[in-house]
Amino acid sequence: MDDSIGVKRHWIWQGAFVLILAGVITKILSAVYRVPFQNIVGDVGFYIYQQVYPFLGIAVMLSTSGFPVIISKLMNDYSEKNHHTILKISALFLSLIGILLFLCLYLGAVPIALFMGDSHLAVLIQVAAYAFLLFPFVALLRGGFQGRHEMLPSALSQMTEQFLRVAVLLGLSFWLVKKGASLYTAGAAAASGSLAGSLVALIILGFFWFKTKRDNQTDRQNENVITTKELTKKLLLYSVTICVSSLLLLFIQLVDALNLYALLSGGEASEEAKCLKGIYDRGQPLLQLGSVFAVSIATSLVPYISMAVKNKELKIMKEKITSSLKLCLVLGTGASAGLICILKPVNIMLFQNGEGTGALQVFSCSILFASLAVTAAAVLQGAGYTVFPAIAVGAGVAVKWVLNTLLVPRYGIEGASLATAASFAAVAGLNLYQLRQKEWLDKLRGVLIPIIGSALLMSAVLLAYTRLWTFLFPATGRGAAVIESLSAVAIGGAVFIYCMMRLGIFTDEELNSVPFGSKLSKFMRRREQNGG
């Protein structure tokens, strides 16, 4: 019995690693491609694409970390004999949702665009609507594979989908801008990249599915039939809870898409407001890059924690939860503090100028809060508490909408950045409060002061370094900004890691579970033995 549990745990962690790797690669690509895209189309073109990106992103997330998680959870909750019924009912359920969302977006494109304050966006919204016709099939197949702990097809399809999406987006936008096409046409072409990526992902998943189908036949005559009513209830519940929680970052972006331009422009068409919204949207790739590891870890936590709860391994579950939250806190704090200190050269390096640096520094605080919010939500979901994280997301979206309305008319994009940080902080605070009520945060108290101290020391070093650089090299071109930014990242990262190692924030076991952690541990032990 113990051996079978051990083997199962091994397969779960091996599969989780595959999905973590795929998630890291796809999220890095999702953040990085926006830099050359902004360089191609400019701030106004970036604004146009970002207005419809939340719709595209929602379709991608539903087919990647929303419904696949739900389907795999259902397959793990019920015996293998019920898997065929689960997949059949899920297929019908997802198809209905996909058609409904498509019709709402496609038929409502003009009213939505008018609500946003830019009627030219209607065509782009209609293009984005087609993504919801493809997502049900992609989500179903990914969920089926993940429910059988076969992570390779899901991971491979994710990476291929993202590579193709980026290639089509950049290629078409570059070609159209070079030809002199309008930025709205380039934006619509860029949005079509998501459709191409989803179609190829579906082909890859279909190939693996039909290839393995014969090896996974079950005896349906002895099938323990689950009622349609029972499964539909669970699908509806999980759709509102798990899916809503996974869409936190996109919902916050959706609020900005719906009301930020209108608030900046005062309800009138304004090129300046479009440019400001595009500058503000520079913060999105920074947020994604800064939180990519925490978000990827959070996604992989759900099936493991569910298995630990199912096997009543509560001590192991609590240890893994503590380690994951600690890692999230460290990565989020370091990324937020470091980026705030070097934001000006990073802004010039990535986006060609330093416009909006102050607003983006405020926005950078969101990295820590978003990382904590997503990771804490995943922990709660894995432990079976799926409703509360969804409520927290709803509260965060409400905070964002209200603060945008109050702050943007007075403070512009700085107010929008503050509203974003506050909304993520609200979600993180609610989820962490719930974890505290479960007594799962006790071991984190002792590491807060060392982490804050490490971040403050790193910030002091970075601020001194950037001032020294400005004094020695007054040039403000993009080439100088690249050298300053990359060298500052190396220096700040080294200082932060060294402080954490010296203060013993992580145990040897925790270090051995992260990339290069064991080498860092050995390096620090050698220094201590040599009197360093």
UniProtKB/Swiss-Prot annotation:
<dbReference type="InterPro" id="IPR050833">
    <property type="entry name" value="Poly_Biosynth_Transport"/>
</dbReference>
<feature type="transmembrane region" description="Helical">
    <location>
        <begin position="179"/>
        <end position="199"/>
    </location>
</feature>
<keyword id="KW-0472">Membrane</keyword>
<feature type="transmembrane region" description="Helical">
    <location>
        <begin position="302"/>
        <end position="322"/>
    </location>
</feature>
<feature type="transmembrane region" description="Helical">
    <location>
        <begin position="344"/>
        <end position="364"/>
    </location>
</feature>
<keyword id="KW-0812">Transmembrane</keyword>
<dbReference type="GO" id="GO:0005886">
    <property type="term" value="C:plasma membrane"/>
</dbReference>
<feature type="transmembrane region" description="Helical">
    <location>
        <begin position="248"/>
        <end position="268"/>
    </location>
</feature>
<dbReference type="Pfam" id="PF01943">
    <property type="entry name" value="Polysacc_synt"/>
</dbReference>
<feature type="transmembrane region" description="Helical">
    <location>
        <begin position="425"/>
        <end position="445"/>
    </location>
</feature>
<comment type="similarity">
    <text>Belongs to the polysaccharide synthase family.</text>
</comment>
<keyword id="KW-1133">Transmembrane helix</keyword>
<protein>
    <recommendedName>
        <fullName>Uncharacterized membrane protein YabM</fullName>
    </recommendedName>
</protein>
<feature type="transmembrane region" description="Helical">
    <location>
        <begin position="203"/>
        <end position="223"/>
    </location>
</feature>
<feature type="transmembrane region" description="Helical">
    <location>
        <begin position="459"/>
        <end position="479"/>
    </location>
</feature>
<feature type="transmembrane region" description="Helical">
    <location>
        <begin position="65"/>
        <end position="85"/>
    </location>
</feature>
<dbReference type="InterPro" id="IPR002797">
    <property type="entry name" value="Polysacc_synth"/>
</dbReference>
<feature type="transmembrane region" description="Helical">
    <location>
        <begin position="371"/>
        <end position="391"/>
    </location>
</feature>
<feature type="transmembrane region" description="Helical">
    <location>
        <begin position="392"/>
        <end position="412"/>
    </location>
</feature>
<feature type="transmembrane region" description="Helical">
    <location>
        <begin position="25"/>
        <end position="45"/>
    </location>
</feature>
<keyword id="KW-1003">Cell membrane</keyword>
<feature type="transmembrane region" description="Helical">
    <location>
        <begin position="109"/>
        <end position="129"/>
    </location>
</feature>
<feature type="transmembrane region" description="Helical">
    <location>
        <begin position="134"/>
        <end position="154"/>
    </location>
</feature>
<feature type="transmembrane region" description="Helical">
    <location>
        <begin position="494"/>
        <end position="514"/>
    </location>
</feature>
<dbReference type="InterPro" id="IPR024923">
    <property type="entry name" value="PG_synth_SpoVB"/>
</dbReference>
